[in-house]
């Protein structure tokens, strides 16, 4: 067999083939061809410099070099294969065609060539091919043959195509959007759905669409009520495996998510992320109606029901409606008597985690919620929220009957009794009823005859603070009650009616 020449390790392209390569592939081609030539020179296997090398060294296009034979067009490949193939694979395909061109006359199909010489046939042509390729492989950089454990020569392009597809142990298909690489084109096609708005899987129950069939399968459990994942500790079942994994941390006490600012640890990632916003002050969720901002999306969702008045969650026991599912869950525990949240200090149990958190402040004496306007501190976040309305003037609770608005829901509830005539607070002494608890408290002093409010000037005592204030105005000579028609002023507003 003749000595290996540069033509033996040359990959040649026609104009159409060269334009088919992208800039990265063209650059790789230049680099590999120049490196092959240097390797042959170092081995003393070439004398004159080929025209191709001269053109490549001058960074000229190689495709119009005069060639001794016509290069067959590459096997037909669909556009989605060629655009996703990595440069290395294109190089390998071309190199295999060069080998096929030189040794195709042997008439052999699927000839296995291994570096250790196994399975090389007794045929003289086979041995020549093996020796030539073995020598050639030693001069080629590893990037051309990323897998050189098995190199095949094919006499038919169909066999070459099949082999290219079989070599999927290498990740050959690259996503042009994010650069991720896949072993098969089907894997790449499946992945590409992420970058598009296309949603192929539709739920027949509710019409919701999903990108993945596995997501649809999980979603269907909402409709079927299927909960295949059961906790061995407490027997609680879940729709998804991930939910069970998270739940188990309650029993193990594992809290893998720790805040670097305050050291507080959490069972789950989502409350940890929410907690971080307390330190940063970040409030990314803004109400479009009033402009109020929240650090949790769930808080914004709850807040929005104030504007809509919508209460879609109804208790089956008593018919009471709520604007949020979690509030209904907590309410239902009043019927069942369930109190799953227990205080470790005193053993007292509660039906919601938020009430337990607020209760714990009693033991610690901590007042962690501070008003930024007046520096007043509060034990509970709900107290701070209500207090802030004094500064903002916000009155989110509106009466549907008369349109009057209030700072707090409790005041709206009391106000509504004016329209309904409801008086739920009864005096045990005389049976008189009142629509507000504060009115009943004032009334009771009539029976106890306690005069707690004493004038510092004259020592006179009064049952009510308002009576003491009126008394003080008389002493100062103030006449705060003015008649609008004639402008006459009086000490007591009761004098206006006489």
Curated annotation (Swiss-Prot):
Keywords on record: DNA-binding, Metal-binding, Nucleus, Repeat, Transcription, Transcription regulation, Zinc, Zinc-finger
CDD domains linked: KRAB_A-box
Subcellular location: Nucleus
Zinc finger (C2H2-type): 173-195, 201-223, 229-251, 257-279, 285-307, 313-335, 341-363, 369-391, 397-419, 425-447, 453-475
Source domain of life: Eukaryota
An annotated GO BP: regulation of DNA-templated transcription
Boundaries of every KRAB domain copy: 4-75
Gene Ontology terms for molecular function: DNA-binding transcription factor activity, RNA polymerase II-specific; RNA polymerase II cis-regulatory region sequence-specific DNA binding; zinc ion binding
GO terms for cellular component: nucleus
Role description: May be involved in transcriptional regulation.
Family statement drawn from the similarity comment of this UniProt entry: Belongs to the krueppel C2H2-type zinc-finger protein family.
Protein name: Zinc finger protein 682
Organism: Homo sapiens (Human)
């Amino acid at each position: 067999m003749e000595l290996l020449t540069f033509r033996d390790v040359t990959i040649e392209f026609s104009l159409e083939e060269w334009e088919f390569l992208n800039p990265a592939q063209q650059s790789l081609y230049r680099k590999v061809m120049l490196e092959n030539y240097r390797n042959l020179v170092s081995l003393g296997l070439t004398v004159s410099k080929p025209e191709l090398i001269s053109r490549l060294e001058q960074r000229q296009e190689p495709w119009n070099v005069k060639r001794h034979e016509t290069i067959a067009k590459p096997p037909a490949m669909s556009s989605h294969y060629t655009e996703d193939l990595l440069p290395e694979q294109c190089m390998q395909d071309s190199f295999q065609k060069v080998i096929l061109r030189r040794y195709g006359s042997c008439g052999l199909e699927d000839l296995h060539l291994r570096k250790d010489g196994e399975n090389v046939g007794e045929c003289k042509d086979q041995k020549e091919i093996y020796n030539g390729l073995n020598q050639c492989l030693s001069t080629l950089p590893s990037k051309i043959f990323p897998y050189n454990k098995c190199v095949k020569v094919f006499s038919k392009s169909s066999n070459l195509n099949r082999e290219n597809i079989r070599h999927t142990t290498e990740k050959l298909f690259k996503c042009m959007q994010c650069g991720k690489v896949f072993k098969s084109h089907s894997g790449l096609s499946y992945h590409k759905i992420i970058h598009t708005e296309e949603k192929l899987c539709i739920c027949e129950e509710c019409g919701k669409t999903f990108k993945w069939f596995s997501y649809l399968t999980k979603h269907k459990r909402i409709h079927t009520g299927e909960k295949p994942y059961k906790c061995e500790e407490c027997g609680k079942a879940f729709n998804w495996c991930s939910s069970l994994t998270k739940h188990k941390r309650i029993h193990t006490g594992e809290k893998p998510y720790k805040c670097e600012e305050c050291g507080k640890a959490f069972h789950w990632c989502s409350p940890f992320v929410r907690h971080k916003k307390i330190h940063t002050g970040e409030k990314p969720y803004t109400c479009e109606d009033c402009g109020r901002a929240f650090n949790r999306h769930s808080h914004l969702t709850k807040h929005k029901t104030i504007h809509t008045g919508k209460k879609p969650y109804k208790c089956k026991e008593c018919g009471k409606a709520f604007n949020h599912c979690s509030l209904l869950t907590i309410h239902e525990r009043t019927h069942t008597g369930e109190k799953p949240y227990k205080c470790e200090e005193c053993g007292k149990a509660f039906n919601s985690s938020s009430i337990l958190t607020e209760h714990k402040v009693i033991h610690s004496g901590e007042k962690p919620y501070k008003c930024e306007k007046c520096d007043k501190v509060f034990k509970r976040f709900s107290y701070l929220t209500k207090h802030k309305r004094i500064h903002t003037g916000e009155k989110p609770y509106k009466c549907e009957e008369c349109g009057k608005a209030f700072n707090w829901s409790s005041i709206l509830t009391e106000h509504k009794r004016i329209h309904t005539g409801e008086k739920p607070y009864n005096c045990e002494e005389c049976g008189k009823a009142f629509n507000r608890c504060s009115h009943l408290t004032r009334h009771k002093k009539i029976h106890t005859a306690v005069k707690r409010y004493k004038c510092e000037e004259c020592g006179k005592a009064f049952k009510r603070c308002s009576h003491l204030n009126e008394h003080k105005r008389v002493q100062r000579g103030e006449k705060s009650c003015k008649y609008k028609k004639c402008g006459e002023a009086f000490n007591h507003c009761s004098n206006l009616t006489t």
